[in-house]
């Protein structure tokens, strides 16, 4: 980080990160533009044991992120798409939260909570997800005594972000178009 930014208050740096992410969304290329910058395989990864979904099922994914995530094939396609955009951290966080809720042992739950926090929530985390300060603060307070619901608010925020941002981009992508053709 440059010395000028280091002198700014922490809240200013957080706000700058939020603005950077929002600007990134606004600066996305139009659908008709040709991707000449970073070539990538536009074919989705196909899960080894998943059956190819029917056209009707694939069309339902447009309407429901839940239906997409419940389908092994849809999940793998969505994950491949997010990887191609270097934005798979939201899905990885959501999955980590789902797995966290299944933990029964308080000791393992505390260990997993710490791991999720360090990987996705804390500032400058390797796969930091974009959540507001309020959500981050509530999540941190919930982790004082970890429970299966410690990450619920953050998970809901990330789910909403995927539903409003990632899902529409996926539906417009070549990944999805290949599935309906």
Curated annotation (Swiss-Prot):
PROSITE patterns attached to this UniProt entry: RGS (PS50132)
BP term (GO), one: negative regulation of signal transduction
CDD domains: RGS_RGS5 (cd08717)
Keywords: Cytoplasm, Membrane, Signal transduction inhibitor
Residue intervals of the RGS domain: 64-180
Record's keyword annotation contains Cytoplasm: yes
Entry GO CC: cytosol; intracellular membrane-bounded organelle; membrane
Location (main, coarse): cytoplasm
Signal peptide annotation: none
InterPro entries: RGS, RGS_RGS5, RGS_sf, RGS_subdom1/3, RGS_subdomain_2
Coiled coil: none
Disulfide pairings: none
Keyword check for rRNA-binding: no
Cell compartment(s), UniProt: Cytoplasm; Membrane
Functional note: Inhibits signal transduction by increasing the GTPase activity of G protein alpha subunits thereby driving them into their inactive GDP-bound form. Binds to G(i)-alpha and G(o)-alpha, but not to G(s)-alpha.
Record protein name field: Regulator of G-protein signaling 5
Organism of provenance: Rattus norvegicus (Rat)
